[in-house]
Amino acid sequence: MKNFVAGAQSGRKIQSGGCAIHCQDCSISQLCIPFTLNEQELDQLDNIIERKKPIQKSQVLFKAGDSLNSIYAIRSGTIKSYTISESGEEQITSFHLPGDLVGFDAITQMQHPSFAQALETAMVCEIPFDILDDLAGKMPKLRQQILRLMSSEIKSDQEMILLLSKMNAEERLAAFIHNLSKRYSARGFSAREFRLTMTRGDIGNYLGLTVETISRLLGRFQKLGVISVQGKYITINDLNGLIELTGTNKTKITLVK
């Protein structure tokens, strides 16, 4: 962490779990580390990145207590972060999409405080932390981008706390769907149609709701004509109606990452 502190549309495709991302011609680089780097700096970063083989569904990327060796940039697929309580209960803390980086929360103690597990087949870029830290000390733009990404993660965590403490069940689920819509849109996918890569149980765990409540609310939203649900696929029919269900005017929650 020493060097980080020192610098201290129409026609879009439907997300289906298979968008690959590459540094040189990345279409969503503004969401990842390469954003703002010039060609020479990008080459230096590219040289330290290890492009791993596919991570299979349910495979764990790292476990709580593991030493921080690398930061992981998701190229495709979805990964969830979660902790396990002393009583053995899982608590999901985040869902990571292509373009997201996983592992920043380990910098404080240099070990991971949570688990990271693939919800579907995923591809990641592994970025050795020591080398990244060294490069960040030499490349101001890289350092600034890393700080920006870390700040965004903190902001998202704060908004999630507000969501859980101030919103009722209906508002939580509506905000979750709306946030996914915005995140997929930022990645070049359709904001209107997308696939839920997480189970309803996972969604309920994340939002502090039961599976039955999630199913009931999805049915209610569908009856209202706000969304259509076909298995794991969601279609937003009435965006303004969905936003109204979030109670956004009351809570001012954005929840984009």
Curated annotation (Swiss-Prot):
Binds 1 [4Fe-4S] cluster per subunit. Its cofactor is [4Fe-4S] cluster. PANTHER family: CRP FAMILY TRANSCRIPTIONAL REGULATORY PROTEIN, FUMARATE AND NITRATE REDUCTION REGULATORY PROTEIN. It comes from the Bacteria. It is involved in the activation of genes necessary for anaerobic respiration. Residues 23-32 are annotated as: Essential for the oxygen-regulated activity. [4Fe-4S] cluster binds at C23, C26, C32, C125. This is Anaerobic regulatory protein. Homodimer. Pfam families: cNMP_binding, HTH_Crp_2. Residues 143-162 are annotated as: Dimerization. Residues 167-240 form the HTH crp-type domain. Keywords: 4Fe-4S, Activator, Cytoplasm, DNA-binding, Iron, Iron-sulfur, Metal-binding, Repressor, Transcription, Transcription regulation. Residues 200-219 bind DNA. InterPro entries: cNMP-bd_dom, cNMP-bd_dom_sf, Env_Response_Regulators, HTH_CRP, RmlC-like_jellyroll, Tscrpt_reg_HTH_Crp-type_CS, WH-like_DNA-bd_sf, WH_DNA-bd_sf. GO terms for cellular component: cytosol. One of its GO terms (molecular function) is DNA binding. Coiled coil: none annotated. It is found in: Cytoplasm. The keyword DNA-binding applies.
